[in-house]
């Protein structure tokens, strides 16, 4: 057998084909020249195949067993699109240009039904289909450039609607040439034609051309969703001639051009498949100038495209070619996560997976493809020996692989594997030599789990044969269970928000980090000390650990299976988490990734296992509605779990911290919470960033410096912002859920909480606020910070607890260099620094906002508007609670940052809870307001024209008043407006509460007739109200008139409210005759001037003319109708 060449180290990923779909096509009868596949699509559940006969085959990916067949008489299937957010819907386009949307009714176990057939593109060739990512809407593009949208309802809604109701079809836009590709994300539709790309805002109906330069030919474009880590915004990648891509922001502006022409001169990587042996040619070719017909977002960091020559996968953010492989005659490609389904021009389908090299080898080992696995190891040995790969593909597995090869036929492979295993030695052995401490015949290696594995050098020994037989049995069982279901083994892409990488993996493998659900070689993992005095002691430790492991596992299984109803939820939960990293540690912000293992003592490990069991038991109980919805029972469950949490993270188990707290510290805890300032200083000399000094400035001026290891328990006045243990992701989630629930329900201490081991009676006498502060400091690293923030504001409403929470956020933020840099520069520089270093949804934004507020005051608060909703008005209210006027200015600016028509709805959304309405109204009327002497006279009545005074927040006050509220709240708001003299709001509320008599009384005192004029004027509606108004005028005339108005003399102000002005309004409203009778009845007719008489005469003339005009029109209509009858 020839020597296998070695691929350069830079290639860390590979395309692999683990199964052939030819038997599936044969079973579907899609392998003939008459009937073959024409289109393909894939979703989480289905693989959809369209055929030349008009049939749509939907095959369930779970086992490739269940399938649906949907027939179409409208012609062959040309395009398929599966709904990404609901697997129950699929859209197809036929060769006649019809678009058919199916509802599969899988949840109701009904028959699939057509819910819509669109003929909008009939007679044209549909070239692209795309689903909306949020609602049931399909976008369709054809060869003449027309793009339409089909808005759908569910089948139930369609049946409930009237028969004449049609599904709306809307033409989105028409481009100048054939639509090549459609993509949709967050309200934006991306259209790529033969000449350029277009970006459409489907909600606002706005369109942008991307770039200025046109191109001619099929070039694709796709969205690249932003990642939660780093708060990256979505971008767009558009293919350009000459192996180039445009990077475009979400507003359609071209940011940069990426050139891949020279990078594609590297030789292609082989596709790992059992069909043929992988071959690699080191010869570097010429640069490739390609046109990318379509771009697809693959995995998390990659963009995929293809040509007639092969498949190309890029990491565009790094301008890097991850790989390219020769796969001929590709017609179309459908992707889901890291799976590729390639449709070839001959109708065949290839199922490929994008995997890291070590995961690919593991999959080959599980399938028993020993020769192919060995060749892959030898080809990619430079990638396999990296520290990241060696954690997954250990030397133990390579030894087993070597033992399965034929010594005669695979001698070259065995020799190369031996060399590869020798290169593993420096990381596998912690001793000076692999063979120095045991014997010349045997050696040992320390696995990642801590097990000492004895490796015999005698290949033909009985122990090796037993081991091989055990592994073979494991492989055969695993292969039997996973037959025709390889998609369940697919490694999922690394999650951008929670993955931990070392430096080497970051440079060589930036795409994904997958972990299989099970490990065939290690049935369980047992942690042992790093060094053991002898192999006998190690074996005894293995025996004890196995006994403890079996006992605890039995107890845990008994607990979890106690209720048969809980079996299914746990299975589904485990299935969702099957591809997550199971051993990634929770990292402290100040720690760096190193290859040294932390030494955990067995007692601590046992304690963590006990906490894991207690957490699983508590989470199981929370699934019971009788526990979850019964506060007393729920609190008992949390108290029981909290006792185990306190035991696990007890202070006495960590060095450098005393076991008892002094009485002075306990008695003055409240003062410490508010009076101490904590500063964290990195030890510059250590270089590793692992030791931290906490410098505490006490009230008396004494400064103490206590160097503490990052594993030590913080004392009563210190925060723990990172975990002292290595905690798995799944356990971290459960701990965060339970710890946050304890904070929300005020379960802050258990009955057994004590530093010295006895019940701490002093802690039971502390107030809930101080207990909450202590709880925050002890378990800050476990909390869900977003939920904790809301709980502190709603449950505790204490400045002490809020300040403690903010101090904890500051401790976490100090690891960010931007937090220190905020001390320098002006406010715009600080905001720009904040935008680039902190994610927009991070809870740490409050810590940064506090730092900016301390430096710049109110201007910093106004700048925080851009961080809404991450920083809410309630956060700002806590931040500047000593300066309410600053909060009021922030709130006013926040509301006015929205379009004016959205002010009421936005303010109503902010008023959560409802009690804020009265607080904010009281703030608004008491700040930047005129003095009460200018609005209210000595008797408590409104001063004339005082409603025209200027109020700083009048718009905000009126918005608060006009929002819907209950009757009691409206009455309280009325009293507030009256007491402060805000008469426009007071009159509005009086009329709304049907207190019209009170309103007209105050209108008379305000003495402004304009209040009763115009469309928005307050006019009496009944005869009794007019009599009341006239009576008020009579009463007013008996009192001495005011000497001057607000702006000087009465003549300078608005028209006053007097008998004549009111009489004119009465005549216009009721007619001159009825007005004159009412005035005579009230005894006011003698006070009227000639102006009133002339006005009444004019009104009578106008009334007669109007009656005559109406009479004439009626007569003409009557004559016309009679003439029509004749």
Swiss-Prot record:
The keyword Phosphoprotein applies. It is found in: Cytoplasm, Cytosol. The modification Phosphoserine is found at residues 532, 534, 693. Residues 477-490, 564-579 have a biased composition (Basic and acidic residues). One of its GO terms (biological process) is intracellular transport. Keywords: Cytoplasm, Phosphoprotein. Widely expressed, with lowest expression in skeletal muscle and spleen. Residues 461-514, 560-579 are annotated as: Disordered. Pfam families: Beta-prop_HPS5 (PF23756), TPR_HPS5 (PF23758). InterPro entries: Beta-prop_HPS5-like, HPS5, TPR_HPS5, WD40/YVTN_repeat-like_dom_sf, WD40_repeat_dom_sf. Belongs to the HPS5 family. It is linked to Defects in Hps5 are the cause of Hermansky-Pudlak-like syndrome, a syndrome characterized by hypopigmented eyes and coat, melanosomes greatly reduced in number and morphologically bizarre, kidney proximal tubules secreting lysosomal enzymes into urine at greatly reduced rates, platelet dense granules deficient in critical components, such as serotonin and adenine nucleotides, leading to functionally abnormal platelets and prolonged bleeding times, and mast cell granules undergoing unregulated 'kiss-and-run' fusion at the plasma membrane. Component of the biogenesis of lysosome-related organelles complex-2 (or BLOC2) composed of HPS3, HPS5 and HPS6. Interacts with HPS6 and HPS3. May interact with all alpha-integrin chains that have an aromatic residue before the first lysine of the conserved KXGFFKR motif, including ITGA2, ITGA3, ITGA5 and ITGA6. This is BLOC-2 complex member HPS5. It comes from Mus musculus. The lineage of its organism: Eukaryota, Metazoa, Chordata, Craniata, Vertebrata.
């Amino acid at each position: 057998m020839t020597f296998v060449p070695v691929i350069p180290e830079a290639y860390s990923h590979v395309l692999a084909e683990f199964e052939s779909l030819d038997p599936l096509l044969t079973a579907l009868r899609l392998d003939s020249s008459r009937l073959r596949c024409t289109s393909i699509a894939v979703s989480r559940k289905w693989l959809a195949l369209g055929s030349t006969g008009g049939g749509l085959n939907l095959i369930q990916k779970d086992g490739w067993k269940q399938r649906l067949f949907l027939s179409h008489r409208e012609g062959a299937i040309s395009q398929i699109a599966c709904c990404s957010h609901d697997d129950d819907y699929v859209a197809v386009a036929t060769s006649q240009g019809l678009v058919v949307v199916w509802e599969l009714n899988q949840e109701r176990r009904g028959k699939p039904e057509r819910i819509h057939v669109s003929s909008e593109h009939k007679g044209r060739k549909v070239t692209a289909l795309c689903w909306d990512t949020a609602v049931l809407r399909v976008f369709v593009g054809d060869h003449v450039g027309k793009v339409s949208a089909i808005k759908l309802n569910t089948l139930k809604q369609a049946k409930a609607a009237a028969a004449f109701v049609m599904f709306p079809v809307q033409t989105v836009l028409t481009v100048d040439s054939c639509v090549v590709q459609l993509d949709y994300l967050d309200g934006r539709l991306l259209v790529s034609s033969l000449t350029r790309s277009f970006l459409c805002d489907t909600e606002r109906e706005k369109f942008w051309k991307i770039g200025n330069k046109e191109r001619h030919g099929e070039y694709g474009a796709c969205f690249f969703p932003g990642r939660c880590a780093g708060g990256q915004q979505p971008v767009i990648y558009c293919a350009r001639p000459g192996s180039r891509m445009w990077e475009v922001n979400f507003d359609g502006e071209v940011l940069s051009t990426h050139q891949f022409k020279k990078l594609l001169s590297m030789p292609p990587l082989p596709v790992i498949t059992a069909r043929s042996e992988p071959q690699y040619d080191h010869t570097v070719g010429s640069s490739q100038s390609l046109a990318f017909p379509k771009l697809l977002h693959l995995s998390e960091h990659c963009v995929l495209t293809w040509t007639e020559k092969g498949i190309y996968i890029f990491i565009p953010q790094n301008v890097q070619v991850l790989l390219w492989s020769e796969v001929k005659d590709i017609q179309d490609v459908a992707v889901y996560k890291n799976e590729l389904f390639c449709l070839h021009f001959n109708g065949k389908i290839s199922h490929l997976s994008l995997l890291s090299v070590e995961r690919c080898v593991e999959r080959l080992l599980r399938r028993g493809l020993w020769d192919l696995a060995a060749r892959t190891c030898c080809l990619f040995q430079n990638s396999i020996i990296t520290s990241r790969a060696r954690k997954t593909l250990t030397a133990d597995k390579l030894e087993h692989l070597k033992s399965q090869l034929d010594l005669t036929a695979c001698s070259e492979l065995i020799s190369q594997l031996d060399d590869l295993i020798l290169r593993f030695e420096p990381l596998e052995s912690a001793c000076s030599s692999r063979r120095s401490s045991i014997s010349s015949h045997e050696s040992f290696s320390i696995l990642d789990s801590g097990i000492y594995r004895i490796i015999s050098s005698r290949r033909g020994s009985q122990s090796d044969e037993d081991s091989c037989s055990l592994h073979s049995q494991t492989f055969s069982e695993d292969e039997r269970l996973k037959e025709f279901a390889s998609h369940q083994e697919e490694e999922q892409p690394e999650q951008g928000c929670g993955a931990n990488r070392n430096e080497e993996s970051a440079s060589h493998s930036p795409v994904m980090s997958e972990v299989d659900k099970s490990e065939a070689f290690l049935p369980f993992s047992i942690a042992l000390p790093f060094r053991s005095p002898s192999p006998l002691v190690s074996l005894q430790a293995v025996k004890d650990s196995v006994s403890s492991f079996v006992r605890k596992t039995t107890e845990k299984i008994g607990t979890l299976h106690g209720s048969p109803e809980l079996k299914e939820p746990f299975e589904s939960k485990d299935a969702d988490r099957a591809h997550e990293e199971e051993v990634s540690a929770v990292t402290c912000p100040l720690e760096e990734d190193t290859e040294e293992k932390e030494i955990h003592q067995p007692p601590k490990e046992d304690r963590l296992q006990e906490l894991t069991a207690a957490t699983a038991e508590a989470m199981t109980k929370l699934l019971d509605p009788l526990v979850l919805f019964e506060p007393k029972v729920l609190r008992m469950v949390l108290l029981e779990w909290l006792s185990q949490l306190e035991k696990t993270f007890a202070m006495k188990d960590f060095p450098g911290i005393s076991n008892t707290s002094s009485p002075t510290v306990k008695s003055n805890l409240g003062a410490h919470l508010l009076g101490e300032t904590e500063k964290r200083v990195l030890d510059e000399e250590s270089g590793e960033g692992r030791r931290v000094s906490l410098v505490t400035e006490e009230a008396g001026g004494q400064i103490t410096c206590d160097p503490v290891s990052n594993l030590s328990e913080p004392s009563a006045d210190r925060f723990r912002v990172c975990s002292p243990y290595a905690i798995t992701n799944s356990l971290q989630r459960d701990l965060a859920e339970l710890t946050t629930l304890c904070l929300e329900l005020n379960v802050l201490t258990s009955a057994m909480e004590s530093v010295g081991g006895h019940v701490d009676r002093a802690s039971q006498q502390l107030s809930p606020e101080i207990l909450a502060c202590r709880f925050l400091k002890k378990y800050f690293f476990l909390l869900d910070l977003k939920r904790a923030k809301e709980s502190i504001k709603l449950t505790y409403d204490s400045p002490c607890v809020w300040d403690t929470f903010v101090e904890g956020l500051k401790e976490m933020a100090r690891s960010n260099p931007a937090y220190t840099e905020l001390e320098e520069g002006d406010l715009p520089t600080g905001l720009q620094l904040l935008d680039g270093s902190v994610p927009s949804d991070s809870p740490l934004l409050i810590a940064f906002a506090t730092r900016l507020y301390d430096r710049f005051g109110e201007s910093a608060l106004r700048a925080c508007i851009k961080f809404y909703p991450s920083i809410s008005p309630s956060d700002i209210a806590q931040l500047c609670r000593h300066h309410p006027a600053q909060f009021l200015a922030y709130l006013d600016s926040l509301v006015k940052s929205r379009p004016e028509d959205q002010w009421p709805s936005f303010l109503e959304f902010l008023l959560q809870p409802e009690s804020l309405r009265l607080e904010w109204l009281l703030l608004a009327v008491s700040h930047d307001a005129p003095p009460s002497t200018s609005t209210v006279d000595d008797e408590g009545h409104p001063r004339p024209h005082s409603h025209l005074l200027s109020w700083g927040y009048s718009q905000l006050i009126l918005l608060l008043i006009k929002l819907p509220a209950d009757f009691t709240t409206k009455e309280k708001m009325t009293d507030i407006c009256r007491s402060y003299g805000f008469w426009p709001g007071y009159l509005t509320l009086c009329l709304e509460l049907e207190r019209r008599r009170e309103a007209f009384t105050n209108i008379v005192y305000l003495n402004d007739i304009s209040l009763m004029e115009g469309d928005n004027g307050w006019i009496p509606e009944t005869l009794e109200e007019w009599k009341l108004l006239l009576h008020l005028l009579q009463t007013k005339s008996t009192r001495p008139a005011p000497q001057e108005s607000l702006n000087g003399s009465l003549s300078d102000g608005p028209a006053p409210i007097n008998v004549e002005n009111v009489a004119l309004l009465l005549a216009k409203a009721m007619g001159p005759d009825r007005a004159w009778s009412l005035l005579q009845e009230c005894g006011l007719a003698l006070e009227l001037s000639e102006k009133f008489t002339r006005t009444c005469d004019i009104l009578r003339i106008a009334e007669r003319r109007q009656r005559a005009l109406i009479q004439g029109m009626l007569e003409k209509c009557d004559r016309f109708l009679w003439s029509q009858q004749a």
